[in-house]
Design a protein with these regions (language model features):
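N-terminal mature ectodomain segment of secretory-pathway/periplasmic proteins
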Residues: 1-17
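Gly/Pro-enriched, hydrophobic low-complexity segments
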Residues: 2, 11, 23-25, 32-47, ...
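Phosphate/NTP-binding elements of NTP-utilizing enzymes
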Residues: 20
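Residues at the C-termini of beta-strands that transition into short coil/loop
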Residues: 16, 26, 58
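Solvent-exposed loop and beta-edge segments used for protein-protein assembly and interaction
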Residues: 6, 64-66
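Short amphipathic beta-strand and strand-loop transition segments with alternating hydrophobic
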Residues: 55-63, 120-125
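A short, amphipathic edge element
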Residues: 44-59
Length: 155
C-alpha cells in the first residue's frame, strides 16, 4: 500500500498493489472506515507536523512496560483538519528511548473517547537509520465495540 497527497493537501491518493488501482480519497471522506476496519483513512495516511499541535502532559511509565513514556496531547491545528480526521484530540504514550507510540486514546468530535490503541513487540527494523516499529497492534473502537488486531507488520 502506498499513500500520497493529491493535488489538494486534503486529498489522498491510495495505491493498493493487490488490486493494481489508485483511489482518490477526498478530505471529508478521510474519517470514514478504511476498508471496513476500525482504522480510518486519516489513521493510515501520512500526517504533517503543521496539521496538529502537541503538548507534553507528563512523564510516566509506559502502559504494560517498564520504560519511560511522554504522555502527549495532540490536537488538530484547524477546524478543517479536525473535521477531516474525525478526532477532537488524542492522548499518546510515546516511548522516550525510540519515540514509538505504544498507546493512544482518540476522542471523537464531541470529546468522547472513541478509540484505544495499543502497540507492542517494538523492534528495531532499521539499525542504520535507528527506525523502530511495533509488530503487534490492537485498535479498539469503543463506540462500535469492535477491535482490530495485527501481528503481521512488515518493514
Amino acid at each position: 500500500m502506498l499513500i500520497r497527497e493529491g493535488t489538494d493537501k486534503n486529498d489522498v491518493l491510495l495505491y493498493l498493489p493487490h488490486f493494481k488501482k489508485v483511489r482518490r480519497v477526498e478530505g471529508q471522506s478521510q474519517s470514514s472506515s478504511f476498508f471496513g476496519s476500525v482504522f480510518s483513512y486519516s489513521d493510515v495516511a501520512m500526517t504533517h507536523a503543521d496539521d496538529s499541535t502537541a503538548k507534553v502532559l507528563r512523564e510516566e511509565v509506559c502502559p504494560g512496560e517498564t520504560l519511560k513514556c511522554w504522555v502527549i496531547e495532540v490536537t488538530p491545528a484547524t477546524p478543517k483538519i479536525r473535521d477531516r480526521t474525525g478526532y477532537s484530540k488524542s492522548v499518546q504514550w510515546v516511548r522516550q528511548d525510540n519515540w514509538v507510540t505504544v498507546a493512544g486514546d482518540f476522542y471523537d468530535l464531541k470529546g468522547k473517547l472513541w478509540k484505544k490503541l495499543k502497540a507492542t513487540k517494538v523492534k528495531e527494523v532499521d539499525p542504520k537509520n535507528k527506525k523502530w516499529l511495533p509488530h503487534h497492534i490492537v485498535l479498539e473502537d469503543l463506540l462500535k465495540n469492535f477491535s482490530y488486531y495485527s501481528n503481521k507488520i512488515k518493514y
